[in-house]
């Protein structure tokens, strides 16, 4: 999911993450992720993922100054409103009472599991030696890995981190985590 996020919004410059490793499992795995990302443009983003809920809801919400997009299952809800920045500056109270907006819902057919499609296209590209089959170039994956590494580092150290992350510090952290895991009692 981070790869789709990064593909849509680009790389943040900073992030802070909370990851309770092993919350739902007896081993160190990222069962939940809460990541707050910051961009030099002033944009912020929240990324929340959990494997510990039965509802299996996939949802992406994008809120800007002119619209809100909400993607849930096979429905895209678009709420277009007057410019929020102007509304905030001119409205007497913090209320949406006088905010003018329109709403639209777009339903589409539910497609196959996205990762299945990505793997199929990767296999086609590999077999045909044709990058044109790919959804995105392989180098794009490095950005997702940097986000993941930054989130792990932030969560383990309890600090906000700048991106790109220092590879030497990240390797030291991973080496320590691997050693700790080797010495952890078996459950």
Annotated model-derived regions:
Residues 1-2, 115-120, 148:
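A general structural signal for well-ordered alpha-helical segments in protein cores
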Residues 1-44, 49-55, 61, 139:
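Rossmann-like dinucleotide-binding domain that binds NAD(P)(H)
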Residues 9, 119-130, 149-156:
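Short, hydrophobic alpha-helical segments
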Residues 17, 47, 71, 78-80, ...:
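Short hydrophobic/aromatic-rich beta-strand segments that constitute the beta-sheet cores
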Residues 24-29, 57, 145-147, 171-176:
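Short, solvent-exposed polar/charged micro-motifs at secondary-structure junctions
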Residues 34, 39, 66-139, 161, ...:
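C-terminal glycine/acidic-rich active-site capping loop/insertion
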Residues 49-51, 64, 75, 167:
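A short beta-strand motif that forms part of the nucleic acid-binding face
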Residues 134-168:
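A contiguous, mid-protein "functional segment" used to position or interact
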């Amino acid at each position: 999911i981070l790869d789709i996020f990064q593909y849509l919004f680009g790389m943040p410059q900073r992030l802070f993450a909370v990851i309770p490793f092993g919350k739902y499992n007896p081993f160190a795995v990222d069962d939940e992720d809460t990541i707050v990302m910051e961009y030099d443009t002033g944009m912020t983003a929240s990324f929340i993922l959990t494997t510990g809920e039965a509802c299996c809801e996939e949802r992406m919400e994008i809120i800007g100054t002119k619209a809100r997009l909400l993607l849930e299952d096979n429905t895209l809800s678009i709420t277009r409103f007057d410019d929020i920045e102007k509304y905030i500056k001119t409205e007497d109270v913090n209320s949406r009472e006088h905010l003018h907006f329109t709403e639209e819902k777009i339903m589409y057919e539910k497609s196959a599991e996205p990762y299945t499609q990505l793997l199929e296209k990767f296999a086609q590209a590999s077999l045909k030696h044709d990058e044109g089959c790919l959804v995105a170039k392989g180098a794009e994956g490095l950005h997702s890995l940097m986000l993941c590494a930054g989130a792990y580092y932030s969560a383990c150290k309890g600090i906000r981190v700048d991106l790109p992350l220092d590879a030497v510090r990240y390797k030291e952290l991973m080496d320590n985590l691997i050693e700790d895991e080797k010495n952890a009692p078996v459950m």
